[in-house]
Swiss-Prot record:
Species for this entry: Bacillus cereus (strain 03BB102)
Entry keyword Mitochondrion: no
Protein name: 3-phosphoshikimate 1-carboxyvinyltransferase
Gene name as annotated: aroA
UniProt keyword annotations, A-Z: Amino-acid biosynthesis, Aromatic amino acid biosynthesis, Cytoplasm, Transferase
Pathway note: Metabolic intermediate biosynthesis; chorismate biosynthesis; chorismate from D-erythrose 4-phosphate and phosphoenolpyruvate: step 6/7
Binding site for phosphoenolpyruvate: K23, G95, R123, Q170, R347, R389
CDD domains with a match to the protein in the record: EPSP_synthase (cd01556)
Length: 429
């Protein structure tokens, strides 16, 4: 268990950063390339642990994949060309891999067993296995399909019209991917619109997808045709430096090639509402996944209330938003964020516990947290508990704190941002 010591930053963070590739888009590009016909080239791929797990799983199913840094080529097998894996498919720490891949495996006529690490073993799978069972898939797991390992024997599926109790892109994507080989039209309706990378990328691979409000539909029997994918920078990774630029005194940062998919930019809306000073310069208008360069500098923030439809658009950014709120004048309330409880850690409890160790005034609620600003943070020993987003949030907090901050289990950041600590060090010089 590696630890990392963060020293206070006295002269701000300054410089340009090229944000690493979007994790959600990188996963999907590999998966869709694997079930497409032809060769897909992916540029800007995120070579983090989670996305490498996706590559490993599809290689195990006979797909020819070559990865060289942030460039990947995938020679697709088509929807019917995957081979039965000889070994257990290990997703590591990746919830995206196991949930989306389950949708693909559900319609593939062979047996597979899927598992991950200790964190994955605690994460709820029934939200995916239940609708897939309704479509006719033969899926089982611990506690009646609630937890991994999952066993899947795929086969002929029937389309369903599914109303999801949660706004989850992973649930929606698993059902849509299963629907590619189902008989009829598959429809998924959500309580709020979740991130739409799957819909956008399916369209780029030639699949017709219909969107009507909170409902997404596709007809079975459609094939994917290989295409080249340019992955923009991950806005969830950018969020740590956006907040750092806003709250660490004397900072000015230029974040290059940040993905600006409107289902993901809740962090931008929240920082604007809190009073942050930044500019957004679009760089690839018209692309299926928009991107921009963002310049942000230190400013005074004010507390706000965050809840409702915006939550699915910033669910992964809430840990670092909570940190921003500790430096804002007044009270910030985050609500409607129950999903935080079933992430890599229970992020409500983890954020509150670790920021409290640093001197923040913050309390947990059933569906979020209340943060009382403005807090002077003091260095301490804290822990990521194996959660990459907690680790990066604590590193930014350490830059602000008086005295050194030691982060235990710091290597977790490699899941989504392998070069995070090197970038942070470079920007402090």
């Amino acid at each position: 268990m590696k630890e990392r010591t963060i020293q206070p930053v006295n002269n701000g963070l300054n410089g340009n950063i090229t944000i690493p590739g979007d994790k959600s888009i990188s996963h999907r590009a590999v998966m869709f390339g694997a079930i497409a016909e032809g060769k897909t080239t992916i540029k800007g791929f995120l070579p983090g642990a989670d996305c490498l797990s996706t590559i490993s799983c599809f290689k195990e199913m006979g797909v020819d994949i070559v990865q060289n840094g942030d460039e990947v080529t995938v020679v697709g097998k088509g929807l019917e060309g995957l081979q039965e894996p000889k070994a257990i498919l290990d997703v590591g720490n990746s919830g995206t891999t196991i949930r989306l891949m389950s949708g693909i495996l559900a319609n593939t006529p062979f047996f597979s067993c899927v598992q991950g690490d200790a964190s994955i073993a605690k994460r709820p799978m029934k939200r995916v296995t239940n609708p897939l069972k309704q479509m006719g898939a033969n899926i089982d797991g611990r506690e009646e399909g609630t937890f991994t390992p999952l066993t899947i024997r795929g086969g002929d599926l029937k389309a369903i019209e599914y109303t999801s109790p949660v706004a989850s892109a992973q649930v929606k994507s698993a059902i849509l991917l299963a629907g590619l080989r189902a008989e009829g039209v598959t429809a998924v309706t959500e309580p709020h619109i979740s991130r739409d990378h799957t819909e956008r990328m399916l369209e780029a691979f030639g699949v017709k997808v219909t969107r009507e409000g909170k409902t997404v539909k596709l007809a079975g029997g459609q094939k994917l045709t290989a295409t080249d994918v340019q992955v923009p920078g991950d806005v969830s990774s950018a969020a740590f430096f956006l907040v750092a630029g806003a709250i660490i005194p004397n900072s000015k940062l230029v974040l290059q090639n940040v993905g600006m998919n409107p289902t993901r930019t809740g962090i931008i809306d929240v920082l604007e509402k809190m009073g942050a000073t930044f500019t957004v310069e679009p760089i690839n208008e018209g692309a299926s996944e928009p991107a921009a360069n963002i310049t942000i500098e230190t400013t005074s923030l004010k507390g706000i209330e965050i809840g409702g439809d915006i939550i699915p658009r910033l669910i992964d950014e809430i840990p670092v938003i909570a940190l921003a709120a500790t430096q804002a004048e007044g009270i910030t309330v985050i609500k409607d964020a129950h999903e935080l409880k079933v992430k890599e850690t229970n992020r409500i409890d983890t954020v509150v516990a670790e920021l409290t160790k640093l001197g923040a005034r913050i309390e947990a609620t059933d569906d979020g947290m209340i943060i009382y600003g403005k807090s002077a943070l003091k260095g301490n020993t804290v822990n990521s508990y194996g959660d990459h987003r907690i680790g990066m949030m604590l590193a930014i907090a350490g830059c602000l704190a008086e005295g050194k901050t030691t982060i235990e289990d710091a290597e977790a950041v490699g899941v989504s941002y392998p070069t995070f600590f090197e970038e942070l060090q470079r920007l402090t010089k």
